[in-house]
Amino acid sequence: MKTIAGFSAAAILCAAGASFAQDYPTKPIRVIVPLTPGSGADIAGRIVAKHLSDALKQPVLVENRPGAGGVIGTQALLNADADGYTLMVQSASHAANPAIYKTLPYDPLKDIVDVALLGMTPYVMIAARGGAYPTLKALIDAAKAKPGQIPFASAGVGSSTHMAAEYVAQVAGIKILNIPYKGSPEAIQDTIAGRTAFYMAPINTAIGLVSEGRLAPLGISSRRRSEVLPAAVPLAEQGFPAYDVTLWFGMWAPAGTPPAVVQRLNAQVASVLKNREVVEQFGKLGIGPQSMAPEEFGRFVRSEITTYQRIVKQAAIPQQ
């Protein structure tokens, strides 16, 4: 009798969840972006939110909650009800944070549900045009001559731009000095001024700066050249075949969000990413739309967490 009762209770819960998902959403959805306005995650999140709103017939409102590498915004997500009406769009920093912080106020594998991958984009190593390092070789030679003294800009300790630069150092066998800034704008300004040797900028940030002649591309992190910035030669073609790094963006929900809602969101996001307008908007920014089922995305996130832990350990980056 207990077994039958337990089975019946489970069946009722499943039916209730399916019914909830079928009616979902019945009110506006909030999407937290734990990074600054204008960041890659913010831009990608807003593009997806607009078209997701059209698909779901409900407003999808983006709210920026930057700070502490995304930790503050992530906490805001976890303080919300797990009902599918509060989501988060974040970058690869989500996977780097467990390696950067000694203790996080949440468990990224247990407290957060992986909903969907949105897209991937390469980094561009940009330096002051006409500056001290006109080529990648010149930069690496200088770093070998002065270990740990050549400064590079990052959008904060543990940011994806920091990790991408540290990985350059590891594959090139050099030591460089991280100069962390509050965000990308400040990092770019000092790179333009020549106060830092380079900045690993997401390609959507680099496109305008390079076309305006304010910065020069020393290389791109992907194995292939980008159509939107063909002047950037892959690091893999400049003597570092192992270097292949991309910045990615994803969507998450609080743990406890009904699985049927997660599946519905994933399916809708996958559909949005095939929309011609979205493909064109992403393409102009150098972002490749890419979708994964929730389970596959979860495996991807776990592998990225492991990768960042290795980078942090090898670079001996002090935990915050």
Language-model-detected regions and their locations in the chain:
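Bacterial N-terminal signal peptides that target proteins for export
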Residues: M1-S8
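Stable alpha-helical elements in mature extracytoplasmic
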Residues: G40, A44, V48, L52, ...
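A ligand-binding cleft/hinge motif common to bilobed small-molecule-binding domains
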Residues: H94-T103, A169-V171, F198-A232
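N-terminal signal peptide c-region/cleavage motif recognized by signal peptidases
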Residues: A16-A18
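N-terminal (or domain-start) structured segment
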Residues: A21-D111, Q149-P151, V157, G173-A197, ...
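An extracytoplasmic/periplasmic, membrane-proximal ligand-sensing/linker region
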Residues: T26-P28, S211, E237, P259-Q320
